[in-house]
């Protein structure tokens, strides 16, 4: 079966953490800390696992990630921003880094999407999911999926260059888009199930039936695809589905998460094309500050079983902020 977008702990985390799409005032901070606490506890378990795999340096980075957090509450407008933290940047292993990275991608691409849709009336977004047959070897299945996606991309490119000479493919209807690749265990097979979630921006409706036939020709082993239009809240959910790919690895058992990290690190798991090509995603995992506003600086320390505790709070006015 195809993986359909649905609510999950991963999507909840991204939706709640994105200040553009979730509550970001002081009242929401306890829930945010609870999400980060859950993420940090998982990272600590993964750190122990990494230590057992003979990776003490990596274990140390995972264990230190998120052990302190600095928030700024801009109380005149009731906005809370994550100002600083000690991130490990191992987003395939660390849920906190995956949450923050996903939020950055979500905001950057939604901002670009607003511009693209304003400039291209009638353009509509579609969520497209493609899969390959499950298998025991994750590396081999990943390569197989990537080969099929490259074949699909090349077929689109060939048609757009010479539509009179080349066969039309459904992917050619997309003027732009973005995709991510994720992997989990198949519910029925227990084997690795890599798949890609894609956003296509189209004027014409893509045909699921035609795409299924094309996809089977490119893969040789799968015709399972899903195509559905996305509007309003569903559109935000579709982009969340794409950008939560790294966070979903933390829902795997530790040994599977470790294997996926070892297999897929340094692989391109996210890419874009056409009207969504070249979106600038900031490397910084903290929130953008609100300039020229006074704030309360809140320093939270990790206290083990007790979770996060407020260790220090200080009020900063405009003049003090300029000196910091």
What are these regions (language model features)?
Residues 198:
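Cys/His-rich zinc-coordinating modules
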Residues 1-192, 202-324:
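Right-hand nucleic-acid polymerase module
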């Amino acid at each position: 079966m195809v993986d359909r977008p649905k609510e999950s702990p991963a999507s909840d985390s991204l939706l709640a953490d994105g200040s553009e799409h979730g509550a970001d005032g002081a009242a929401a901070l306890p829930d945010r800390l609870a999400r980060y606490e859950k993420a940090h506890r998982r990272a600590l378990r993964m750190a122990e696992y990494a230590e057992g795999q003979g990776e003490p340096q990596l274990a140390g980075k995972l264990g230190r990630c998120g052990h302190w957090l600095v928030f700024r509450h801009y109380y005149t407008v009731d906005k809370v921003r994550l100002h600083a933290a000690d991130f490990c940047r191992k987003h395939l292993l660390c849920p906190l880094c995956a949450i923050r990275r996903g939020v950055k991608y979500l905001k950057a691409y939604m901002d670009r999407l607003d511009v693209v849709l304003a400039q291209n009336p009638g353009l509509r977004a579609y969520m497209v999911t493609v899969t390959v047959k499950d298998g025991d070897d994750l590396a081999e299945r990943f390569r197989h999926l990537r080969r099929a996606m490259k074949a699909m991309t090349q077929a689109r490119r060939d048609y757009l260059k010479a539509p009179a000479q080349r066969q039309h493919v459904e992917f050619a209807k997309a003027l732009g888009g973005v995709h991510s690749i994720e992997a989990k265990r198949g519910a029925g097979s227990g084997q690795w199930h890599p798949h890609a979630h894609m956003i296509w921006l189209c004027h014409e409706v893509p045909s699921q039936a035609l795409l299924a036939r094309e996809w089977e020709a490119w893969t040789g082993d799968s015709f399972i695809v899903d195509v559905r239009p996305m509007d309003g809240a569903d559109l935000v959910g579709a982009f969340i589905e794409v950008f939560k790919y790294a966070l979903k690895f933390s829902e795997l058992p530790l040994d599977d998460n470790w294997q996926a990290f070892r297999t897929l690190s340094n692989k391109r798991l996210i890419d874009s094309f056409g009207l969504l090509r070249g979106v600038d995603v900031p490397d910084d995992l903290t929130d953008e500050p609100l300039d020229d506003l006074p704030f309360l600086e809140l320093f939270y320390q990790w206290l083990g079983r007790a979770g996060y505790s407020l260790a220090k709070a200080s009020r900063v006015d405009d003049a003090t902020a300029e000196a910091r």
